[in-house]
Amino acid sequence: FIGVIGVAVGEISNQNNEKLLSGSKIFYGDTIVVKPKSNAQILFLDETVMTVGESTELTIDDFIYDPKTNDGNFVTNIKSGIVKTISGKISEKNPENLEIKIPNGSLGVRGTEFLVSLNNKKESTVLLLGPGPENTLGMVPGNIKLTDGINTTVITSPGFQAMIQNVVSLAS
């Protein structure tokens, strides 16, 4: 397994329509489906934390992690809904090894906390929550590179966001 459901409120299931509860294991290739009026928190082995809002579907396309070296690769495909992520050890060591796919683009995440909100697969909003380049906690500053296949936007300041609409579908 690559992670566990830390918190499950309401109806959460996997691609086989098996109910997921707190403590349920998450595996490579799993699709997590969170129904309306439900939410979940997923804790991954590299200490990445995803808080998954209602009416959300995401798939773990790739997760390879070596806890001895913190090397790995993590690719998630968010198909609908809203997901808040705090990146873990994979992104901390190799920021280019964490990728978030969305219906109309993809994100390259560089060690940070961020929110992705999808509106009916037609509009994606990405918000950088932090830490920024001038944080007082001594944390490595993060940034997000958002691309729609044609244009690329880099968000480096917490509280800033970018949006893409109906451009190119990179995620299937």
Language-model regions, residue ranges each:
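Short, charged beta-turn/beta-strand-edge "cap" motif at the junction between a beta-strand
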Residues: S38-A40
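Flexible, surface-exposed loop/linker segments and immediately adjacent secondary-structure boundaries
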Residues: F1-T31, K35, F44-V168
